[in-house]
């Protein structure tokens, strides 16, 4: 349980109405300790500034921009890859950043700064060369474009749009463009020429051709606004638009129809009532299912005929359409119809739109995995919800007032997340708790210290263990005496590094000292310094030609290196997958969407990071919003690596899949020097891996996309292995299981 004793005391002693207010009364040391673990309000008092600068500078965004010193800001954001949370601070200190920052820092900050014409002139003077200014300007934001008079070249426009497609809108509004360029951009990128440069090229045929390319209602409306009215009255244009409306593109043409089609209501058919009040008696029409689907979004224009529409829907069993207009048909909904809507409609309906909140309806919503089950609390007590298997605590619940209405819901939240700084921060500092709800929350947490509320299941889950202050043991690397009496052949290799402090060089030297590695492709390493360059000579290891054996031994090396505090980051395979971040934020995670490479490649020293630097390295590699701990980063590395070697290894394996999986797990444990035996069957994992293997074998792609939850069993296995790794590294905790 997160300790809130000091916060509770401050809350009571100072008669605070919010927990945020109470946080401001904490002793600085206590406040900083909580800030370090990510448990803090959305803003901090000035009195904590110096301590935050010293101990957790990445949290400077919690102060108002004017409170943050420019040099402190620049020093901090220079080290971070993801600076989204510093957006207002970056813009506030724009001048200091432009004057002080180098090219890479300015590029990093460009999306957040409101750039003026004077700023562009300054950047041109600072960074001479067309390519430099074009590259820097490619990161500009739309707010800057709306405020400047600078005219972008066609090359600059293409560069900007290649980086962010939707930047076409402010650019096209900003300046008149050549018609040939506009046509090229339409053909190449599908960008509608909403620019006065195209006006002289327009004719009815061209207007229709452009409308055929439109995919956003806003673009259609804005394009028609610049067209000459005489051309908009052409019959060919009118006929095309009427047909487009009948195809369901209603939002695209609402202003146009009201101005130009008042005399064509008969041609509009059932859709006429959307634009003109009760223009058509729809009871005289033969209404199709497609038409009902199209008009369901606009049911407020058909209230006169709602009974007629409902009769058609029920006669034809169009449950999906009934669900889409549920707010207009409350009087006809029985319990049976509510259940049918819940079970048969493609898209979930809001529970608040279901007029009957019976236990049976609730059970159906649970089975269909509705996220707003909490709304049944207006009729059903929380114990019944839990008994039926409901989880009323979801992302949706934060959008409601239920936490202030039900103290039992807060207690349930604490049982689920009381160990998680991120999730408790959301409820305590970001949700508008009343004074009474805040008091109940603090009292419950303070009176249930330790892990008492999390026994017996939660304490052995990976999300719980990741939020606890555990560590992974790093065995000391044995000293290896350097041997300089090595005879190198002409075909032996040389690597060069810029300094002895280069992280890849330091990893290489440490790796060379670790005994028992099987596949690391460098042996007999020596190095010398020459002209400020570190030259490393080595003899390549002999290749292992049996692919399956190579993969297994390579995983052993990765695990063995981890046991000595050198962790492998598999970003070449998984470029954006960080399951640990989801877990410490209390969110569900699924398998990665894509594996970038289907071949297990050789290992290189620069891919291994020392444990004490791992949190920063992983956070920057994946451009996270905050820095995770070394411990959390290590588990992310282990889990990602194990997943990759299971999936890609099984694709290459010629063994029976079950034998391969068990062998991989044994090798992984052996490399980590963990004495564990998997007691659970892996048949479900094998089924998933075999499906991936079949798919990969049938194609010739160098990568593979994964469907959501396609590897759920495999991920569960990886989680269990990580849990065992943590428990083995923290034996005192393991003994209390």
Curated annotation (Swiss-Prot):
Interacts with host KLC2; this interaction promotes IEV trafficking by engaging the host kinesin-1 complex. Interacts with protein OPG056. The keyword Iron does not apply. It comes from Vaccinia virus (strain Copenhagen). The modification N-acetylmethionine is found at residue 1. Disulfide bonds join 496-535. Belongs to the orthopoxvirus OPG064 family. N-acetylated on initiator methionine by host. Plays a role in intracellular enveloped virus (IEV) transport to the cell surface on microtubules. Together with protein OPG056, forms a complex that interacts with host KLC2 (kinesin light chain isoform 2) to engage the kinesin-1 complex and thereby promote IEV trafficking. The gene is OPG064. Keywords: Acetylation, Disulfide bond, Early protein. This is Protein OPG064. InterPro entries: Poxvirus_E2, Poxvirus_E2/O1. Induction: Expressed in the early phase of the viral replicative cycle. Pfam families: Pox_E2-like.
């Amino acid at each position: 349980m997160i300790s809130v004793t000091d916060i509770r005391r401050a809350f009571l002693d100072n008669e605070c109405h919010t927990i945020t207010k109470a946080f401001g009364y904490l002793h600085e040391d206590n406040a900083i300790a909580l800030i370090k673990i990510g448990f803090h309000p959305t803003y901090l008092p000035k009195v904590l500034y110096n301590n935050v600068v010293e101990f957790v500078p990445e949290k400077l965004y919690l102060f108002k921009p004017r409170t943050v010193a420019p040099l402190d800001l620049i020093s901090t954001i220079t080290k971070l890859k993801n600076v989204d949370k510093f957006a207002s601070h970056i813009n506030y200190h724009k001048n200091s950043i432009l004057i002080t920052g180098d090219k890479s820092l300015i590029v990093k900050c460009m999306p957040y700064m409101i750039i003026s014409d004077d700023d562009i002139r300054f950047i041109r003077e600072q960074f001479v060369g067309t390519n430099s200014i074009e590259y820097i300007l490619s990161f500009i934001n739309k707010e800057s474009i709306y405020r400047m008079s600078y005219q972008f070249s066609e090359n600059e426009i293409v560069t900007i749009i290649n980086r962010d497609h939707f930047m076409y809108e402010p650019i096209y509004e900003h300046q008149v463009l050549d018609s040939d360029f506009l046509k090229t951009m339409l053909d190449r990128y599908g960008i509608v020429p909403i620019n006065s440069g195209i006006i002289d090229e327009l004719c009815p045929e061209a207007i229709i051709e452009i409308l055929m390319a439109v995919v956003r209602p806003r673009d259609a409306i804005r394009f028609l606004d610049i067209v000459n009215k005489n051309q908009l009255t052409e019959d060919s244009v009118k006929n095309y638009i009427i047909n487009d409306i009948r195809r369901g593109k209603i939002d695209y043409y609402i202003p146009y129809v009201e101005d130009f089609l008042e005399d064509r209501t008969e041609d509009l058919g059932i859709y006429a009532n959307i634009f003109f009040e009760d223009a058509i008696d729809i009871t005289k029409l033969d209404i199709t299912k497609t038409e009902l689907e199209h008009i369901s979004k606009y049911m407020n224009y058909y209230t006169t005929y709602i009974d007629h529409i409902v009769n058609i829907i029920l006669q034809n069993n169009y449950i999906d359409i009934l669900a889409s207009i549920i707010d207009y048909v409350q009087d006809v909904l029985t319990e049976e119809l509510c259940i049918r809507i819940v079970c048969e409609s493609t898209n979930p309906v809001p529970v608040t739109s279901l007029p009957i909140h019976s236990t049976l309806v609730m059970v159906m919503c649970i089975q269909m995995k509705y996220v707003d089950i909490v709304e049944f609390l207006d009729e059903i007590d929380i114990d019944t919800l839990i008994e039926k298997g409901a989880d009323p605590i979801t992302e949706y619940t934060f959008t409601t007032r239920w936490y202030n209405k039900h103290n039992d819901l807060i207690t349930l939240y604490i049982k689920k997340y009381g160990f998680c700084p991120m999730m408790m921060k959301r409820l305590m500092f970001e949700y508008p708790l009343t004074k009474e709800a805040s008091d109940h929350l603090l009292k419950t947490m303070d009176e249930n210290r330790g892990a008492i509320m999390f026994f017996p299941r939660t304490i052995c889950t990976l999300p719980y263990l990741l939020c606890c202050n555990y560590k992974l043991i790093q065995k000391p690397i044995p000293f290896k005496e350097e041997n300089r009496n090595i005879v190198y052949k002409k075909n032996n290799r040389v690597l060069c590094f810029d300094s002895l402090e280069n992280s890849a060089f330091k990893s290489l030297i440490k790796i060379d000292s670790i005994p028992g590695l099987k596949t690391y492709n460098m042996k007999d390493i020596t190095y010398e310094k020459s002209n400020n360059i570190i030259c490393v000579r080595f003899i390549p290891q002999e290749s292992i030609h049996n692919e399956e054996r190579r993969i297994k031994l390579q995983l052993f090396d990765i695990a063995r290196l981890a046991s000595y505090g050198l962790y492998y980051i598999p970003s070449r395979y998984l470029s954006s997958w960080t399951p640990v971040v989801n877990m410490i934020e209390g969110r569900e995670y699924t398998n990665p969407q894509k594996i970038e490479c289907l071949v297990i490649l050789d290992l290189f020293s620069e891919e291994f990071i020392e444990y004490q630097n791992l949190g920063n390295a992983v956070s920057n590699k994946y451009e996270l919003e905050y820095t995770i701990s070394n411990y959390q980063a290590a588990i992310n590395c282990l889990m990602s690596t194990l997943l990759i070697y299971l999936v890609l290894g099984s694709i290459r394996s010629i063994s029976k899949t079950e034998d391969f999986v068990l062998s991989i797990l044994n090798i992984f444990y052996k490399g980590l020097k963990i004495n564990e035996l998997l007691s659970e069957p892996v048949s479900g994992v094998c089924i998933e891996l075999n499906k991936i293997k079949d798919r990969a074998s049938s194609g010739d792609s160098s990568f593979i996309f994964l469907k959501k939850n396609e590897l759920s069993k495999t991920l569960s296995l990886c989680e269990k292995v990580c849990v065992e790794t943590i428990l083995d590294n923290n034996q005192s905790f393991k003994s209390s299981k």
